[in-house]
């Protein structure tokens, strides 16, 4: 049996280390999700973000955001990666797209933050 080595992406490994050192439980939970194999990370479509959020919410996705569906209110989406169409639809609705790498500096208010895992 092969020993589990974790992510081979150096940037993801550094991000996991950085997130796990944070004091907020949300970032520790995101670090746990990122430690899973890449095929077990969540892939969230735009229509789910639209369904489960209110205007001006912050959504954290420890995986990839895909562009199926429409978004009819502004939402800030933080994720490991985005498809091109998902970025366009989020920005078209007045929302913001933030990578997990930059989210530690930009997300300060945790009142309207939702973690979405599919």
Curated annotation (Swiss-Prot):
In terms of InterPro entries, this protein maps to: Ribosomal_eL18/eL18-A/B/_CS, Ribosomal_eL18_arc, Ribosomal_uL15/eL18, Ribosomal_uL15/eL18_sf, Ribosomal_uL15_CS
What Gene Ontology molecular-function terms does this entry list? structural constituent of ribosome
Respond yes or no to whether keyword Hydrolase is given for this record.
no
Q: Which UniProt keywords apply?
A: Ribonucleoprotein, Ribosomal protein
Q: Name one GO cellular component term.
A: ribonucleoprotein complex
**Which Pfam families does the record associate with it?**
Ribosomal_L27A
Task: Spell out where the chain crosses the membrane.
Answer: none
State the family it belongs to.
Answer: Belongs to the eukaryotic ribosomal protein eL18 family.
Q: What is this protein called?
A: Large ribosomal subunit protein eL18
- Organism name: Sulfurisphaera tokodaii (strain DSM 16993 / JCM 10545 / NBRC 100140 / 7) (Sulfolobus tokodaii)
Lineage of the native species?
A: Archaea, Thermoproteota, Thermoprotei, Sulfolobales, Sulfolobaceae
Gene encoding the protein: rpl18e
């Amino acid at each position: 049996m092969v020993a589990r080595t974790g992510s081979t992406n150096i940037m993801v490994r550094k991000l996991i280390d950085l997130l796990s050192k944070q004091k907020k439980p949300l970032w520790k939970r995101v670090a746990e999700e990122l430690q899973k194999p890449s095929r077990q990370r969540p892939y969230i479509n735009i229509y789910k973000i639209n369904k489960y959020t209110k205007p001006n919410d912050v959504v954290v996705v420890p995986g990839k955001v895909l562009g199926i569906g429409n978004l009819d209110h502004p939402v800030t989406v933080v994720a490991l990666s985005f498809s091109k169409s998902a970025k366009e639809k989020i920005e078209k609705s007045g929302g913001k797209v933030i990578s997990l790498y930059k989210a530690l500096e930009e997300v300060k208010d945790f009142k309207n933050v939702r973690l979405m895992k599919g």
